[in-house]
Amino acid sequence: MTKDILILAVETSCDETSVSVIKNGRDILSNTVLSQIESHKRFGGVVPEVASRHHVEGITATINEALGDADVSIEDIDAIAVTEGPGLIGALLIGVNAAKALAFAYDKPLIPVHHIAGHIYANHIEEPLTFPLIALIVSGGHTELVYMKDHLSFEVIGETRDDAVGEAYDKVARTIGLNYPGGPQVDRLAAEGEDTYSFPRVWLDKDSYDFSFSGLKSAVINQLHNQRQKNIPIIEANVATSFQNSVVEVLTFKAIQACKEYGVQRLIVAGGVASNKGLRQSLADQCKVNDIQLTIPSPKLCTDNAAMIGVAGHYLYQQGRFADLALNGHSNIDLEEYSAE
């Protein structure tokens, strides 16, 4: 009988302290998430120093809670996986140092995991990954299209040239007057409004899979400023609808085109913006028309969590990709350089 593989995973790349125990690469035995949203809300965004302090305060209790929820001891764990980057360096270091301490104290292998690889592997929890596939990455810091021909094989075929989609959502939300985090609130408003503004769709070069959202963001902000200066009433829901439709149309079109060009029948979506209802519906509609299998994680697995790190860590464990105790956090890591090839 094959022995179960248990991975203890740690995620502290931004403003969630999360620890999870994953069995055999898919089964979530525990997934504890300590959110900092309320602490950052008054600042209108994540403050790195505040995030780091909260990670320090919460990491030990979160580890203990995850082990308790999974009903396992640290001795039962086969390896420790941890997000090494990209992310906020101070936040990353809390998780990395905690993982190194556990690996040293209990003589466990240490597995460094790329944060975006984790988001990709959140899909594996919902439905086993089959290859080749296209992954659409949409988050506060990243907007990418990635071609994968096998596990841990990443070829970035498109990326944002300026703002990430989640960043654009947050800035538009602030301009409208919505509280942090703005993305979910824009999505909610968009369901109530009408597409009354002609905001731009930025396609860039012909056949390019790159993205650009700074022009769209500026167009929305300028429109709102002009209306306020002229005392023209603003229907916030219509602004949200028009903005979101512009974003979703571009993301959907390029994702579907990438699937067609690369001859794949599997599209997965990863990152916090993957929980956006408008995007999920648009992709579902177009994948159905084009006979493409679509997988999007449940909303709780779209945002940062350690379960996704544990799943990616499982496949790194199988490949023997371990780190020594000199492992450090990195604010930027290229996904392709992290690829198994």
Swiss-Prot record:
It is found in: Cytoplasm. Its EC number is 2.3.1.234. GO terms for cellular component: cytoplasm. Substrate binds at I137, V138, S139, G140, G141, D170, G183, D187, N276. Keywords: Acyltransferase, Cytoplasm, Iron, Metal-binding, Transferase, tRNA processing. InterPro entries: ATPase_NBD (IPR043129), Gcp-like_dom (IPR000905), KAE1/TsaD (IPR017861), Peptidase_M22_CS (IPR017860), TsaD (IPR022450). SUPFAM superfamilies: Actin-like ATPase domain. It catalyses: L-threonylcarbamoyladenylate + adenosine(37) in tRNA = N(6)-L-threonylcarbamoyladenosine(37) in tRNA + AMP + H(+). The keyword Metal-binding applies. Fe cation binds at H115, H119, D304. One of its GO terms (molecular function) is iron ion binding. One of its GO terms (biological process) is tRNA threonylcarbamoyladenosine modification. Pfam families: TsaD. Binds 1 Fe(2+) ion per subunit. It comes from the Bacteria. Its cofactor is Fe(2+). Its main location: cytoplasm. Disulfide bonds: none annotated. The keyword Electron transport does not apply. Required for the formation of a threonylcarbamoyl group on adenosine at position 37 (t(6)A37) in tRNAs that read codons beginning with adenine. Is involved in the transfer of the threonylcarbamoyl moiety of threonylcarbamoyl-AMP (TC-AMP) to the N6 group of A37, together with TsaE and TsaB. TsaD likely plays a direct catalytic role in this reaction. Critical mediator involved in the modification of cell wall peptidoglycan synthesis and/or cell division as well as in the positive regulation of the activities of different murein hydrolases. Essential for cell viability. Belongs to the KAE1 / TsaD family. This is tRNA N6-adenosine threonylcarbamoyltransferase. It comes from Staphylococcus aureus (strain NCTC 8325 / PS 47). The lineage of its organism: Bacteria, Bacillati, Bacillota, Bacilli, Bacillales.
